[in-house]
Amino acid sequence: MLTLHLVFLYVFNRILILIYIITVAETKYIFVTGGVVSSLGKGIISSSIGKLLQARGYNITIQKFDPYINIDPGTLNPYEHGECYVTVDGMETDLDLGHYERFTGIQTTKANSLTTGRIYKAVIDKERRGDYLGKTIQVVPHITDEIKRNVKSLGQKYHYDFVITEIGGTIGDIESAPFMEAIRQLKWELGKNAINIHLTYVPYLRAAGELKTKPTQHSVKELQSVGIQPDVLILRTEKHLEEPVLKKVANFCNVDLDCVIQSEDLPSIYEVPINMQNQGLDTAILRKMGEPIGEKPSLGPWRAFLERRNNAKDTVNIGLVGKYDLQDAYKSIRESLSHAGTYNDRKVNITFINSEYLTEDNVAEKLKGQDGILICPGFGQRGIEGKIVAAHYCRTHNIPTFGICLGMQMMVIEFARNVLGYADANSREMDEKTPHNVIDIMEEQKNITNMGGTMRLGAYECVLRQGSRVFDIYKKEHIQERHRHRYEFNNDFQKEYERAGMQCVGRNPESDLVEIVEIPGMKWYIGTQFHPEYQSTVLHPHPLFVNFIKAAIAQKSNK
């Protein structure tokens, strides 16, 4: 009885502690801003901070505030904005959320991505409902209050220890002004539970042989002018900064010397967390926020990944067939290939092949030397025929081929034209009058007129056919993958495809939508309607990409 009593007291005590942690423990907020120029890597720094705090046992999340007026980046041109990243709950977001997930392994949601457009829409909707009781709606306090609500609600709802918020753009931008005011207010209200980390640029003037700190000083001055004193400065630089430079920045910017961190150019973005840890960024954050420092985490699995990556000597060549030559347009695909290369002990050389200029006359030359071909996702007519040409060449030459979303659809169309004998086969997206619409618009999409946020988005279940190649790759029957599409494989043609050798080996159990096609007799010829690149992380590479690279390595060995 005494033992049972002691056990009961122990369990009761643990429950009380848990309740205390959940209800009383305060969420800490870290705001990451940028100055001097854009594209300094705030997303990588935010991801690295998240990784370092996570390694210390903290429950973290990272959110991105984009100051543009679009509701989301779903309809933005990839040339302007890069890749549109899709969260598990179907939100179209900035590509930085991909970095957050790949570094930390967390799953982001709609709450992790916010734009000025969504903020204003929420406020206007409230005004129309009468929530403000006839008050004049202004940037301060109504817009800033809505921003603050979105910051704090994320931490309060899910009881995170740390919420890291990256503010897009640079200090001084007109679009960022409401966000900066909201941060100023939050820092005042939350005290030591909120800090600002400001990322700036220290240029090197080659002609003079000097590093210039003046842009950083002006950037901090601009930040101070809106009422925000940075707690930590991170200096992006091409050259190593000696201590006198760091002391100068600390002195003129009112920041502790040990809170001035330099971020040199590194061979890989995945080395940034180690670099930040070596300079004590995580300990500076914890000290500023009144948290215990504890022991320095080893980051063992992360270091093992980097060691394996750096030790890889052999290479494998992968051709990306797409129409956007901006690297960021296929960011998640490139990173997924890189992860898969590391876990196959190979460096992946990626060559972009513009499908707009790919023809039957030059395809052999353009694809020469590639060990595997990935046909990229996309939308619209431009570059489509080039993707079909690539699919035909790869299929007839038995080259490992991976088609994603539109890439898979082009593999299906090519097969219909050249194997099934339907020379006019096409997608309804490209040709509404084609009699052989092997790719058709989804039934639920037919009456939708708005473009933004209306596709089949987010994670859906897929059931794999036992005995198929993809079943062997995943090693399970039921999977979940993320989607972003309006068009689908037309099931009216399924029997013809399967009789001719292209198998439909993955299906959604509710809608019967074909998710995966493969040709079993080939070395590796797989197309997916979903986007597997959204689920590949540093420590958990996606099995399809790992197996694809493995097939490409075998292809290279057999040449």
Map each language-model feature to its residues.
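Short beta-alpha connecting loops at secondary-structure transitions
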Residues: E80-V88, L266-Y270, I375, T396-F402, ...
